[in-house]
Amino acid sequence: MGVTLRDKGIRAHDALIIDRNGDFHITNGFSAEKLEELEESGIEAVNVFNFGPVLVLDGEQQYHRGEKAHYTNTSPNSPNPRTAIGQLGPLEYLMVVTDGREVQSPLPDGGTRQHLGCTIVTLTEFMASYHCIQAYNLDGGNSTAMYFDGGTFSTSVRRGVTDIIYFATLADPGN
């Protein structure tokens, strides 16, 4: 099944598993055993992302304002560039990218504005406000670009990127 693109050991971060129907399944602390359990339950993993953390799980927000977020690889309590993906319903998704740290945007008056990014709590609240059933934080630390319908929405890529999440609509060529 599938093609192996990377064959390295992984840390036990939360994992986002996307099945053949395009549905999201999230495990806290990913392991080969958890993947086997999922597949034994009849869910075939087509894509697995290992970064995290999970932001919304089964419609429940996982981080709340006033709480200190704990997660090993994301500086969760500091504003940073972030990328998140959420599932709103069957084959309905939300992608969010926020630049941060060093990104400057021009203002109409000729000045510039620095993008500060956001915290994990802020990102969680945003994804929950759009009623995501599942939402997951992907790596956004100067390694994300978002293009949509021919337009560029984020270009904070400052290092080589070898991964892509791509959405396409299958349309009947006769219509």
Where are the predicted features?
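Gly/Ser/Thr/Pro-rich low-complexity, intrinsically disordered segments
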Residues: 1-175
